């Protein structure tokens, strides 16, 4: 998993509450178990018209936000079913950070497992970030995970809280398998060294 240390990128605003996982990645894209290629289906019911053409009104289709790395979204993002395809689709599109006042628990945990930083902020901070994100091409935020700060385009800085274990895993690029190996590595190395010293009949 890619390490998350500092992220600087355009933030796209989505002033919509209760965006569920069905809207993040519709069911027709769930047939695959691959993590790649799902970015095409991200928010597809909002991104595309019925004829398959792009909806020009959707934020990620607008020139200023096509390469957004950060989403600033409404309350209760990622609610609904527990599909891990939702963070897969976000990551494949290029989204590394999502900021809201609250997330569904399963989605929140799945983000961390897939290298996406989900940040919870109070309503007044979210409104400030929405205003920053609505600047279009100038909507650049800088996320410093080690310092737990969000720096806006005007230089203002907001602080956020994060669980220390989640922070450690993201900073070091550790998913569940990587974390297990990281924790067990000394014991594994000692066991292998002991085996190497044994005399086999």
From Swiss-Prot:
What EC class is this?
lyase
Q: Which superkingdom, per the lineage?
A: Bacteria
By what name is this protein known? Answer: 3-isopropylmalate dehydratase small subunit
Instruction: Give the HAMAP family listed for this entry.
Output: LeuD_type1
Q: Name one GO biological process term.
A: L-leucine biosynthetic process
The record's comment on protein family reads:
Belongs to the LeuD family. LeuD type 1 subfamily.
UniProt gene name: leuD
Q: Which InterPro entries match?
A: 3-IsopropMal_deHydase_ssu, Aconitase/3IPM_dehydase_swvl, AconitaseA/IPMdHydase_ssu_swvl, IPMI_Swivel, LeuD
Q: Name one GO cellular component term.
A: 3-isopropylmalate dehydratase complex
Question: Which keywords, in A-to-Z order, does the entry hold?
Answer: Amino-acid biosynthesis, Branched-chain amino acid biosynthesis, Leucine biosynthesis, Lyase
Pathway entry: Amino-acid biosynthesis; L-leucine biosynthesis; L-leucine from 3-methyl-2-oxobutanoate: step 2/4
EC numbers: 4.2.1.33
The job of this chain, per UniProt, is described as: Catalyzes the isomerization between 2-isopropylmalate and 3-isopropylmalate, via the formation of 2-isopropylmaleate.
Q: Which reaction does it catalyse?
A: (2R,3S)-3-isopropylmalate = (2S)-2-isopropylmalate
Molecular function terms, GO-annotated: 3-isopropylmalate dehydratase activity
How would you summarize the oligomeric state and partners of this protein?
Answer: Heterodimer of LeuC and LeuD.
Q: Which organism is it from?
A: Methylorubrum populi (strain ATCC BAA-705 / NCIMB 13946 / BJ001)
